[in-house]
Each structure stands twice: as structure tokens, then as C-alpha cells.
């Protein structure tokens, strides 16, 4: 008789045939979101930030506010149709009895009343609920009744990227579609100020393009060069700024070395400024869905930080967004206190 051969009734366990885990699965196996955990831990010594939660009329947005309150990051003020908010809470078995509710008839009314709470010093942050971002921002940017400042409003993602040692700020991937050079000055400065509020000791800003050399045929390289010169002349402050840089030599020391780019930013950037919204949105979503990153979103340049979350966000990303807003609000309180002295 021939040698007995074991039959295999299941999938082969060889490395070649083993199913590769997705980035999300790899991410789930990590013990914690260490970078986000550090941000949340920094908020433990800070009082919860009074936050107007705008139109939390679905389970996702209402639960996000409640979770952030449970951790001690915010004190939610729920702004929207009272009956509908209570209906959502009852259906999802969420306890909202301890939270103040400001009744509003519809989503745009919710946005207007939330902004009014800020103007009346009853709230120090805004948090987007189930209304469209344009509805919320429309109320924020109104000249007479909104929350405008001298700065242009811009958006930052604070990203927790696996394998990257520190949080990575990407701007602007959500608000400014095709920003001008003038717009980008504020976009860069907003991101720098945010990095300092988050406790970054040395802020290193990479102005991204498709290449690391100035090319007259590629407008983003010209704007990058101009922004760097503006930083040299003190028109942008608080950071090392370099560009144009391609993504690889902005975040990879090896790539920067191969390209022979000698710069304190190249290969070590912790703030990435993208040419336009499309590039930024694709970069952030690529990191999220291909590399297992999480993204905490915040809008800056208004009187108060504005928390933007997505229904697809993880619990940790939602909490991180609230932690970022709390740290920004605390930095503004400290700045105001210093100015009064």
C-alpha cells in the first residue's frame, strides 16, 4: 500500500494561502489608539467644555455627544426639535435627562440657535449633529449674526495613523474647495495654532504638491514657495515651514534622504497642507480606508472650535474630535486670561 496521505478538509494554513487581514482588522487588534488616548488623557484636568450639539436627531450624533459627556470631555446642550430628540433617545435607550435641550423647529433653526448660544457665552464649542455641514457653516459665517473672526475658516483632520509616531494634521480637506494663496496663509496658521494647542513641541509644516521642486507650470509649487517665504518673513509664525514637498519626502526620512532634501521638515512633517479640498479629502480617506487610520475633524477660524464628525467614525475618533475641541477651547480661555492681566 502507498503511504497514507492526510486529506485537508479546510483552508490551507500555509502563509501563502492564509487570508490577509484588512487594515481595519489589523487596527482592531492594536491594544489602543495611543495617540488619541494621549489627547483624551490631557483633557482629564480640564473642565468639560459647554458644547452646543446642533440637531442631534439620529442615534449616531446623539450617542456621540453622550459618550463624550460620559468621558468628561463636553457638557452637551442639545439644540433641535425636542420631541424628535427625545424620540431618538427613547428608541436607542439613551439617557438624556441630565442634558439641557434648546428647542428648534428644523435644522437651519437649530444651527442659528446653537450659534446664538455661543454669542451669548453659553457654549464654547459647536458639535455637528445630523444636519448637513453646509447648514451649520451657513449659520457660522453670517456676517451679522455668525461667528466670524479675522481668520478664514478652515478644517483640520487630526489623524491617528498606524505606524506613525505622532498625530498627523491634514488641512484643508473639508471646507475650502480651491483656496487662494491668501486663503492658504490662514489655513496654515490655523493648523499651526492647533498643533500648539495639542501640545506639539515643534510644529513642522509640509506644503504638499506632486513634486518637491518649484515648477512654473504647477501652481501649487509656486504657492508653496511663496508660503515658505512668508514664514521666513514672519507673516506665518510658530512653525518650521517647507515646500513644495511630495507626500513621500514629507513624511518618510528615507524618501527625503534619497531625494537629497536637506530640511528640518522633510521626512518629519507633522502638519500636511494640501493644494485643494479634493487632494486633501482623497489623502485623508486613503489613510482611513487603506491604512486603517482614524480621523478626528475640527473646524477652526471661528470664535469657537466646531466639531465635525461622520456617521462612519469610530467611537475613539468621535471622542478624539471632542478632545481636540476641548484643548482648543482651553487654550483660548488661557489666552483670554493672559490678555486681561
What residues fall within each predicted segment?
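Short, Lys/Arg-enriched N-terminal segments with co-localized hydrophobic residues
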Residues: 13-28
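Anion-binding alpha/beta catalytic cores of soluble intermediary-metabolism enzymes, centered on
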Residues: 29-77, 81-341
